[in-house]
Every structure is written in C-alpha cells, then in structure tokens.
Amino acid sequence: LPVFEAKDHFLFYPIQYEGQECSKNIFYSGAAPNQQAEPAVDWLLKNKGKDFFLVGSDYVYPRTANTIMKEQLKANGGKVVGEDYLPLGNTEVAPIIAKIKQALPKGGVIVNTLNGDSNVAFFKQMKAAGITPANGYSIMSFSIAEEEIAAIGPEYLEGTYAAWNFFQSLDTPASKTFTKAFKAKYGDKRVTNDPAE
C-alpha cells in the first residue's frame, strides 16, 4: 500500500480482503468480511450449530476474518472451540485434524479460510478421519470454487459449503454470459471464479 501511494500508482486487488483499509490507489473488487464471512456465519449459526472451529492459512486475511468472526460468534451465542493456522501451501494438516476431532468429537461447524494446496490435503485427510457432513460436521470454505473442487476432488467436498461472490455455475443470465465469453476467449476447459469475475 505505501509503495502504490508513494509512486501514485494504481493496484487492482480482486480477491477477498480484510476491509480495514482504504486508499485512492487501490481498487478492491473482492469481498470484505461483511460481504462474505459475516453472512456465512449468520447462516451457519441459524442452520448448523453454535460450536465453531476456525482453520486458516497463516496470513493477514484469515487471521483478520477469524478475529471478526470470533466477535460475531460471541455476540450471537456461538462459541469458538478451536482455532489453528497453516503456513501458505503447507500440507501437514494432521495436527489440525486431530485438534478438530478433539474439540468437536460429536460434530460441529468448521470455518475454513485455507488457501491453495492446503485445501487438497485438508479435505482428503478430513474425510479419512471421518470429519464429514454425514458424521455431523458442517464445513464452510471461503476460498473454494469450481477450480479448487476439480483439484481436491468433488467426492471430498460432498455436502460441504462455500461462500464466495461468484461461481461460474451460478444460474443467472449475467453469469452465463460472462462464463461463455470467458471460455470463448481462454478455452472451454478454463474455469473462472470469484477473483476473475
């Protein structure tokens, strides 16, 4: 941020962000927590349970979003029973899986702000450990769309939830037009997602 302001250059920032800064040199088009995380937590509280485990990649967005969600949960009768972070790209998820099992032995809500390859290992190992919707776990992810589903494998995500501002499978005229134009330009096998929208 200081570099763009000092040089008076412009940055387009298309992914979700913390929402706690503003600059005339940055155009944020991604969701802030009040547009993604907070509505998802409201829905989870009303429909899925009160005991939450927060897991995320270890950088500013997951930590800030989780701080906001903890306050929201506290104010609305929810409870954080655990919280843990992985360095970006880390696939050593077994310790986190063990913590989830210990904190939520009979099921509960898991909010996932992991990114990248961490999600592949996370969902595969969660299924192997029996942490699935069929066993009473509601899992909400904030950085998973069609491309990530293909990388992880849909069989590992069945019954889980994702909250993002755009999915190419969204059944609206605008989504269909955008996705068709995107595929015409970049190829039919390419997948668009929230940041690309």
Task: Label every PLM stretch briefly.
Residues 1, 12-14, 51-56, 106-116, ...:
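Periplasmic-binding protein-like
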Residues 1-13, 19-21, 126-135, 155, ...:
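Extracytoplasmic "Venus flytrap"/periplasmic binding protein-like
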Residues 5, 45, 98-101, 150, ...:
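Alpha-helix boundary recognition
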Residues 8-9, 78, 188:
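Short glycine/serine/threonine/alanine-rich loop segments
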Residues 13-14, 30-31, 164:
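Pocket-edge structural micro-motifs
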Residues 18-19, 24-129, 169-177:
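Extracellular/periplasmic Venus flytrap/periplasmic-binding protein
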Residues 126-197:
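Extracellular/periplasmic periplasmic-binding protein-like sensory domains
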